[in-house]
């Protein structure tokens, strides 16, 4: 509901839904955000604080897709709570932070889409079994390549992953 869009159907009903939802956010937004932050902290403890894992979870690890969602939700809740103060709500993230967040989101989604496609199921663990295949797809590596060069591309992909989650983790800490 925080990022709802009217794709089809009655605009009047959609606007009424949005109005009622905003009223609920005004009443309970602080509590909702605190609950989301508590969920995040529990998830990070369950998954582990060490986000430099060899086989990371693209969705649940610290700095991953869940944290990006938390940032977006936090911004949307803040905007709803401060609807009359557009300057404040539009300045929550700098242009550089927005660009960094978008870049992280796009890279993590790219990894996750390739992972789902190659594993032929919902899968969020970037295991060794898929790292070579995904790096080949991302960097368009020719089939015939030395193991050393192949490892270079896997390392490049993982380095980009770590950079993305580090950036997201740093932005998430603004909200926690």
Show which residues each predicted segment covers.
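A nucleotide- and high-energy phosphate-metabolite-utilizing enzyme signature
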Residues: 1-176
